[in-house]
Amino acid sequence: MTHVQHRISILLLAGALAVATIAAIPATAAVAADTPGTGTCTTTITGPLTGALTAAVGTTCLNNVVLHGAITVNPGAALSIVDSTIYGAITTNGASAFTFCNSSTVGGAISVATSTGFILIGDGGEGTCAGGHIDGAVTLNANSGGVELGGNTIGGAVKVSANVAPTGGVPVEDAATEIEGNSIGGTLTCSGNTPVPTNDMTPNTVNSSRTGETCASSTF
């Protein structure tokens, strides 16, 4: 297997690892690892890492990682997290794709906004992306490439707003935002989604209030 050369630039603040920026450098071939929703990895990271991490370009894949820090995904970049533990928040704005699979854990919140590609945070159905554990809130706002939030245990609130169906040749089941089979500790709020969200006949457990669109139903 050939490996993409990559650079991790680390800034030191007060003697601690502060920021790690992942940037792919051209190489003869990409890492031969396909990840659901994000395509082929251009940079793969495994093992322990301390400090905040920014996925700057290409597709960054975290496999069996324990990260003590937050993650930011830059516009146009993609991130896949599989079998990993993140002790911090995850924030994406304008990402090309985001995947969170196979019992991964996040110690903070997940915020995904204005993404142009598919967002897969666990699959509550029969897919290959098992849900994970998210201690904080989940916010999904103004994404246009398809969204699925399934089979997760979520400690905080879930807010799903202004997401629109992807255009061009997507499966029917991916046209609407899917929120299915989650256990949600906080509120579930949906608004302004086109079309309205579906639970794909796999209800969610919500320990607080449910409001907006289909999400307001006690059977959603």
Language model segments and positions:
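N-terminal segments that cap or nucleate solenoid repeat domains
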Residues: 33-82, 218-220
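Acidic/polar low-complexity surface segments
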Residues: 97, 101, 116-130, 159, ...
